[in-house]
Amino acid sequence: MFKVLVINPGSTSTKVALYEDEKEIVRSDITHDVETLKNYKSVIEQLDLRLEAINKWLSENGIKVLELSAIVVRGGLIKPVQSGTYVVNDIMLEDLRKGVGGEHPSNLGGIIGRALADPYGIPVYTLDPVAVDEMEDVARISGLPELPRKSQSHALNIKACIHRYARENNLKEEELNMIVAHMGGGISVAAIKGGRIVDVNNANQMGPFSPERTGSLPSMKVVEMCYSGKYTLEEMKKKIVGMGGLVAHLGTNDAREVVKRIEAGDKKAKLVFEAMAYQIAKEIGRMAAVLKGDVKTIILTGGLAYSKPLIEIIIDMVGFIAPITLYPGGDEMEALRDGALRVLRGQETPKIYG
């Protein structure tokens, strides 16, 4: 029997779970107060806060790190890699600390995992990190050669959805063309060709705005803001990732609260909420063009897929493209667990980063 601890840092929470083989023993979603997170200038500064919360959770649940077979974490913005399971080695750890691929809560996963595991010599793995890159060359070109488009997405859940759909429908992944829209604190809309993510908006910088990210912005106006003298570099980064989207417009990243406001007659909340759904649907349409209309299904997943009002707007706009499949929430925890178990059972050889 293998004991596996799974750690999945998100924008405003850290999901943790203990498994004995495939059996879930305990699972929690440790929520971090938005106002508290605002006090941190960067994601890396949240390390002690999140590590303390996890240690408290471990203690409350009587979990001893020494008894674990492995820790597996959600991967962060490292250098571009192929899909698969990786050892969180020193090279990856350094790149996560530096944020070589950018700022993202998942950068903390490997750092937290190693902080817990190193005193006991326990292996730490990551699976299908945000930096998974399968984009076609034509999708990388932007209007400036200095600024190529990069593949950064919620690859873990996107890949889990591909695996699940293929399994449930008795289909081969390499024969599947589909669109997967992961909708959470950040939003990734991916074109899947032959099971590969051939194009995707960069959830930190492009595409639809989300509960706390701006998505694509009018570039000239962004330049003007940067040179206005009103904002530092870090303040501008925070505006785009962390303080954008619903947070910027409505002061909350909770779509459920926004829906309550709408039901209470808040017209601004209604307009902003509909705009977010509109932009998600528009991005799905863009990805349908990438696949030349050959779309088996459109999968809507992530926490926002629980929002019936949001889903209704999206389906109304893109239902003509392909049948809609709903996988609300995400299979990220199970996907991470399964990756670690495959390695522990000798079914897969972990890849080495760097």
Curated annotation (Swiss-Prot):
It catalyses: butanoate + ATP = butanoyl phosphate + ADP. Signal peptide: none annotated. Transmembrane segments: none annotated. It is found in: Cytoplasm. GO terms for cellular component: cytoplasm. Keywords: ATP-binding, Cytoplasm, Kinase, Nucleotide-binding, Transferase. One of its GO terms (biological process) is acetate metabolic process. Its EC number is 2.7.2.7. The keyword Nucleotide-binding applies. The keyword Nucleotide-binding applies. InterPro entries: Aliphatic_acid_kin_short-chain, Aliphatic_acid_kinase_CS, ATPase_NBD, Butyrate_kin. One of its GO terms (molecular function) is butyrate kinase activity. Pfam families: Acetate_kinase (PF00871). NCBIfam families: butyr_kinase (TIGR02707), PRK03011.1-5 (NF002834). Belongs to the acetokinase family. This is Probable butyrate kinase 2. The gene is buk2.
